Regions:
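Short beta-to-alpha transition helix within the HATPase_c
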Residues: 3-21, 25, 49-51
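Acidic ATP/Mg2+-coordinating residue in the GHKL
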Residues: 82
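Short conserved segment of the HATPase_c
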Residues: 87-100, 104
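Conserved glycine-/histidine-rich ATP-lid loop and adjacent helix of the Bergerat-fold HATPase_c
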Residues: 118-127
């Protein structure tokens, strides 16, 4: 999987496929019709970073994970949304810091926040902008990963 080239869509589809083999949840991957697809190197940091966020969506979703990929002539973006409870308000402004733990939360789904911290750090070191927020269209969490195409092509 590593040290070849592929498109963002292929990155995401390969990661989603690995989760579909072990998860009962439904993954819905959509590609913008305007997508300007180009190949980029398969880097372990990108694989782990994207995988961490898709894994979190799988962990906290009730039934579905929505992934939207789009690229125009300037930017490329992966949006990952779930239908879970979303980020607790008490940690929302601290998402991405290590060891963040919510005071509120499902006891079965507690974590130290290291997955988000690691995923965000790996992607940002590869010139991505990562935004973690509660979804504006669904009940759950949303992660938006954006690159300038010039940065993505020069990884």
């Amino acid at each position: 999987f590593i040290n070849t080239e592929c498109s963002l869509e292929e990155y995401v589809n390969e990661i989603v496929k690995s989760f579909e083999e072990i998860s009962k949840k439904k993954f819905i991957v959509n590609l913008s019709q305007d997508t300007n697809s180009f190949n980029i190197p398969k880097l372990i940091e990108l694989v782990y970073g994207i995988r961490n966020f898709i894994g979190n969506a799988n962990k906290f979703s009730k039934e579905k994970i929505y992934i939207f990929i789009k690229s125009d002539n300037k930017l490329s973006e992966i949006s990952i949304e779930d239908d879970g409870p979303g980020y607790p308000k008490d940690i929302l402004n601290k998402i991405g810091e290590p060891y963040i733990k919510s005071e509120i939360g499902n006891q079965n789904q507690k974590g130290l926040g290291l997955g988000i911290f690691i995923g965000k750090t790996l992607l940002e070191r590869n010139r991505a902008k990562v935004i973690c927020r509660n979804s504006q269209t669904r009940s759950g969490a949303e992660v938006v990963i954006t690159w300038k195409n010039t940065d993505l092509k020069n990884l």
